[in-house]
A protein has these predicted regions:
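Non-catalytic, conserved peripheral segments adjacent to functional cores
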Residues: 1-105, 124-126, 131-133, 138-183
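Short beta-strand His + acidic residue motifs that chelate non-heme Fe in jelly-roll/DSBH
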Residues: 110, 118-123
Length: 183
């Protein structure tokens, strides 16, 4: 596994070694030993999976302290633009984002540490998306930032008339109206 740093400290891309032959391909998608050596010491306790169609944007979500979550995300089928926004108070990259294309062909994974809002846009007809979390889902601690906050300047790569959102994701505050609880 190769680790690729992004412009925001702590957010890293994992690129596995993929072995291909006439039968197809094989790669190790996760190893605790290698992850802890190269990325972070964390214990994932919950795996989630979602299936979405083209134009769906999920996010930008987070869980408030003390229920914060680090995530390791990947695409099984299809393609997404995966976005992480730094919400850590005092961070030199506060309010900045990383956007990475994750696809069934590139097999990339993205590690998002505590203190980030996370979301993704579906770029393919359909996507099967998986993520590991190091804390359990806690509905009482749900939070979010508005997906199209103009200050974030995220290019979701979906035409406005094709965007599909949940009702909840249309009601999140702008970053400037959010008081960060993340250190």
């Amino acid at each position: 596994m190769e680790i690729v740093k992004t412009e925001i400290e702590g957010v890293v891309i994992l690129e596995p070694r993929v072995f291909r032959d006439a039968r197809g391909y094989f790669f190790e998608s996760f190893s605790v030993r290698e992850f802890e050596e190269k990325v972070a010491h964390t214990t994932f306790v919950q795996d989630n999976e979602s299936c979405s169609s083209y134009g769906v944007i999920r996010g930008l979500h987070f869980q408030k302290p003390p229920f914060t979550q680090a995530k390791l995300v990947r695409v099984i089928k299809g393609a997404v633009l995966d976005v992480s926004v730094d919400l850590r108070k005092g961070s030199p990259t506060y309010g900045k984002h990383v956007a990475v294309e994750l696809t069934e062909d590139n097999h990339r994974q993205l590690f998002i540490p505590h203190g980030f809002a996370h979301g993704f846009a579906v770029l393919s007809d359909e996507v099967l998306f998986q993520y590991k979390c190091d804390n359990y889902y806690a509905p009482q601690s749900e939070g979010g930032i508005l997906w199209n906050d103009p200050d974030l300047q995220i290019d979701w790569r979906i035409p406005a008339d094709k965007v599909v959102l949940s009702e909840k994701d249309t009601r999140h505050p702008l970053l400037k109206d959010y008081i960060s609880e993340f250190e």
